[in-house]
């Protein structure tokens, strides 16, 4: 590794000092990370000279080559970086995971508006109140508002009255005409409560509460007391900023050990309407992270760009990011940083929201892992899970992937890809493939005295599971690590101790953890197999007269250049339906490639 870094560093010090983008690649020419720089040489040198975080150390351990693209300006570099990241989706760059966020109350923009809970803002002139952290209390208040003020619940118009009309909870706007004035009066009362004007309604509740106690109707008294408490609490939640009436987003980055939390507090007309939590596992520094986030987040198709975007980081050049967002979205937003008393209060709120979001994210995974431990009959929590999948194209270029999840979160530094050697040309045998990859992985762990995972997940059914278990048994570690498989058809979980299999309900947190591991392993294996095939296809297009379609046909029908070698020109011609002259060129190419690589 040191030798590789030394030779890389020698190349780095010869790089230009102009602006541009750089790509860090592994031994298979897979792009691991894409970055941009005002000074390419200086920026890339920093990876070798500075004190590095654990993630960057792991990245540099896997980097075998660095490619650069120079640009005329820093802005061009930013634009290029944005396009390259979207195209290649490197593992070590920012990949956003949406947090659910707290609910808000939406009043629709309709002739007879409806009032309901939502987690999504739609730009259709609807009014929004919130967000509300206590969902239970919000539900109580909404139930009270809908019952008290006869707000419409039905979406469509009808010729007959609805159930709510018969219960006295609706004016009947779904089937009656000309109720606009009466309905608006009811709606204004509901809005008044959501705007925090609750003193009058609290007085009415107090009167009803006293009457209920006098009549010894304690059940109703408890309900009224709960409604009063809920009204007071949600009134306190409505936070209004006095800075201005513009639409402003406040973006805060909260770095964590494995996951970074990015909070966006959205103010519309001076009122907080939404908290959006995003989670990121990239290796980016704080400054790089916020710039990449701003570009990805605000250039996405459905995102509404506010008048101003306030970031809580000093001394960051955001001009290019601002320009790019405005060009792509045709807006006039400003990215700013200010320090005022009001903004510092918003920052405190952003920090507490970030900490809360991270706790929720981690707690969600902890509960799922606890549940998984019980279903899989494990002694310990499956803190470390290693997942395996196999990929091939009709028996060609069979590869395997191994992904690692720590506490339910992808731990990409530990991912591995394997070119499998035990299968014959054209042989499709997932059982044999699983045996090879499990043997290679856990022999390495034993030989290097590395930490075993708590759980191994195999993509497949009983056959693949038994194959993996037989290897673990041969290595004498079958009692040190739990192994299970997940079959795609019915999402059945198989254990060596349970012949029937376990079927959890769709959406169950424990099943979702296993699905995430399985899907990630599947994505990595397929991606690796695709890259291997593309590499071979590209090689064949160097033959005079061979286009991409014929190159793909050679790969599909014959395989690699090694598979071409034993074939005659007639056999090549027959297999891929080309003339003898072209078959001759293909044969000559295979002989030449073999001589170069032996």
Curated annotation (Swiss-Prot):
Residues 17-94 form the GIY-YIG domain. It comes from the Bacteria. Residues 199-234 form the UVR domain. One of its GO terms (biological process) is SOS response. InterPro entries: GIY-YIG_endonuc (IPR000305), GIY-YIG_endonuc_sf (IPR035901), GIY-YIG_UvrC_Cho (IPR047296), RuvA_2-like (IPR010994), UvrABC_protein_C (IPR050066), UvrC (IPR004791), UvrC_RNase_H_dom (IPR001162), UvrC_RNase_H_dom_sf (IPR038476). The UvrABC repair system catalyzes the recognition and processing of DNA lesions. UvrC both incises the 5' and 3' sides of the lesion. The N-terminal half is responsible for the 3' incision and the C-terminal half is responsible for the 5' incision. Interacts with UvrB in an incision complex. HAMAP family: UvrC (MF_00203). This is UvrABC system protein C. It comes from Borreliella afzelii (strain PKo) (Borrelia afzelii).
């Amino acid at each position: 590794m040191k030798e590789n870094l030394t030779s890389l560093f020698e190349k780095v010090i010869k790089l230009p000092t102009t602006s541009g983008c750089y790509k860090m690649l592994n031994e298979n020419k897979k792009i691991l990370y894409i970055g941009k720089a005002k000074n390419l040489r200086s920026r890339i040198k920093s990876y070798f000279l500075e004190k590095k975080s654990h993630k960057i150390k792991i990245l540099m351990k896997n980097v075998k080559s660095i490619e650069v693209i120079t640009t005329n300006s820093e802005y061009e570099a930013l634009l290029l970086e944005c396009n390259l990241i979207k195209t290649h989706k490197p593992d070590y760059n920012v990949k956003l995971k949406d947090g659910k966020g707290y609910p808000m109350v939406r009043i629709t923009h309709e002739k007879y508006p409806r009032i309901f809970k939502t987690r999504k803002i739609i730009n259709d002139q609807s009014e929004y109140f919130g967000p509300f952290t206590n969902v239970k209390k919000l539900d109580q208040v909404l139930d009270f508002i809908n019952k008290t003020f006869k707000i419409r619940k039905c979406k469509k118009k009808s010729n007959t009255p609805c159930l709510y009309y018969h219960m006295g909870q609706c004016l009947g706007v779904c089937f009656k005409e000309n109720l606009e004035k009466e309905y608006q009066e009811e709606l204004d009362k509901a809005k008044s409560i959501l705007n925090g004007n609750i003193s009058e309604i609290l007085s009415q509740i107090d009167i009803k509460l006293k009457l209920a106690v006098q009549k010894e109707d304690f059940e109703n008294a408890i309900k009224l007391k709960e409604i009063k408490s809920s009204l007071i609490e949600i009134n306190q939640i409505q936070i209004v900023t006095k800075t201005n009436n513009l639409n402003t987003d406040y973006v805060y980055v909260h770095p964590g050990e494995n996951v970074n939390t990015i909070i966006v507090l959205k103010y519309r007309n001076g009122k907080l309407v939404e908290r959006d939590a995003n989670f990121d596992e990239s290796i980016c520094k704080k400054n790089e992270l916020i710039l990449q986030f701003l570009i990805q987040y605000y250039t996405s198709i459905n995102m509404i760009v506010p008048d101003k975007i306030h970031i809580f980081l000093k001394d960051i050049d955001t001009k290019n990011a601002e320009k790019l967002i405005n060009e792509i979205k045709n807006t006039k937003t400003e990215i700013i940083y200010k320090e005022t008393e009001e903004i510092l209060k918003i920052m405190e709120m952003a920090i507490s929201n970030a900490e809360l979001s991270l706790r929720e994210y981690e707690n969600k995974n902890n509960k799922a892992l606890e549940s998984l431990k019980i279903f899989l009959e494990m002694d310990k929590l499956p803190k470390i899970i290693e997942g395996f999948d196999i990929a091939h194209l009709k028996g060609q270029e069979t590869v395997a992937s191994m992904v690692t999840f720590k506490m339910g979160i992808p731990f990409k530094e530990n991912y591995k890809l394997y070119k499998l050697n035990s299968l014959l040309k054209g042989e499709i045998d997932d059982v044999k493939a699983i045996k090879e990859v499990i043997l290679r992985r856990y022999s390495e762990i034993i030989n290097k005295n590395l930490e075993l995972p708590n759980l191994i997940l195999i993509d497949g059914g009983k056959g693949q599971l038994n194959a993996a278990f037989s290897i673990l048994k041969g290595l004498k570690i079958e009692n040190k690590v739990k192994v299970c498989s997940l079959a795609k058809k019915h999402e059945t979980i198989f254990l060596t101790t349970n012949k029937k299999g376990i079927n959890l309900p769709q959406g169950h947190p424990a099943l979702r953890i296993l699905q995430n591991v399985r899907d990630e392993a599947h994505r990595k294996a397929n991606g690796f197999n695709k890259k291997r095939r593309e590499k071979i296809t590209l090689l064949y297009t160097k033959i005079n007269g061979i286009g991409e379609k014929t190159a793909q046909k050679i790969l599909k029908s014959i395989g690699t250049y090694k598979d071409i070698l034993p074939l005659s020109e007639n056999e090549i011609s027959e297999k891929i339906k080309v003339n003898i002259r072209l078959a001759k060129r293909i044969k000559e190419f295979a002989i030449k490639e073999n001589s170069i690589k032996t």
